[in-house]
Amino acid sequence: MALDEVKITRAIVESYLESFLKCTDVDVALVGAGPANLVAAKRLAEADVRVVLFEKRLSVGGGLWGGGMMFPRIVVQKEACRILDEYDIWYREFEEGYYVADSIEVVAKLTAGAIDAGAELINLVSVEDVMIREGDRIVGLVINWTAADMAGIHVDPLAIRARVVIDGTGHDAAVCRVVQKKIPGAIVGESGVIGEKPMWAALGEKIVVDATREVYPGLIVAGMAATTVAAGPRMGPIFGGMLLSGEKAASIALEKLAQSVD
């Protein structure tokens, strides 16, 4: 068979647009494809929720790839090992309570898990604003190509509708900061987006899970973004809290969706 370059082009464009159009009206839109949101996306998709996950970079995985200081290993505490088991991720006990996993395997399998469950992942797309309705409730996202932002060119964005948004943008807490900046009087969380504190692994791992919650009508925060909003300390290359945070964020989102139906 002779290959036709134009057919290759059409196959890519038509199939992508078909998928993209399905993502313009979803139940849950997740921003930032780090470990917390990858776990959340899988949980939500398994519950037959329409899910799209936007990542501004070329690659997904957030800070997982580099492990600790470019050593591709991460540490997970015992209570989160069950999530690694769910994805068939290999790990070993280093010392009591400290389990080590290959960071690249973790990224690959978390990503595959979300996709296999039915979540749609879209990379190279940035979220620059939110969409609101009565009472300034968040009802969607305003998106644009990351390349347009990097090039500094003015291109009007597009919008997608979502019943719930999850900010998993890491240290930036980007969606939360947009809400705080652009909605008069908006208070994200208890005191607004304060920013993270210096490292304290034990406390940071607790706070990242405790701080995973709805912080503004229609907006849930997960992972390091939750820590940033709650002014918790960073925790470094231990990722159990991130995985548990994603699990909790999905559970909260499902509760919110059920309430909106009622």
UniProtKB/Swiss-Prot annotation:
InterPro entries for the chain: FAD/NAD-bd_sf (IPR036188), Thi4_fam (IPR002922), Thi4_prok (IPR022828)
Keywords attached to this entry: Iron, Metal-binding, NAD, Thiamine biosynthesis, Transferase
Molecular-function annotations in GO: iron ion binding; pentosyltransferase activity
Catalysed reactions, semicolon-separated: hydrogen sulfide + glycine + NAD(+) = ADP-5-ethyl-4-methylthiazole-2-carboxylate + nicotinamide + 3 H2O + H(+)
Involved pathway(s): Cofactor biosynthesis; thiamine diphosphate biosynthesis
Binding sites annotated in the UniProt record for Fe cation: D156, H171
Biological processes, Gene Ontology terms: thiamine biosynthetic process; thiamine diphosphate biosynthetic process; thiazole biosynthetic process
EC number of the protein: 2.4.2.59
Family (UniProt): Belongs to the THI4 family.
Family matches, as HAMAP family: Thi4
NCBIfam families (alphabetical): sulfide-dependent adenosine diphosphate thiazole synthase
Purpose: Involved in the biosynthesis of the thiazole moiety of thiamine. Catalyzes the conversion of NAD and glycine to adenosine diphosphate 5-(2-hydroxyethyl)-4-methylthiazole-2-carboxylate (ADT), an adenylated thiazole intermediate, using free sulfide as a source of sulfur.
Subunit field text: Homooctamer; tetramer of dimers.
Name of the protein: Thiamine thiazole synthase
Protein source organism: Methanothrix thermoacetophila (strain DSM 6194 / JCM 14653 / NBRC 101360 / PT)
Gene this protein is translated from: thi4
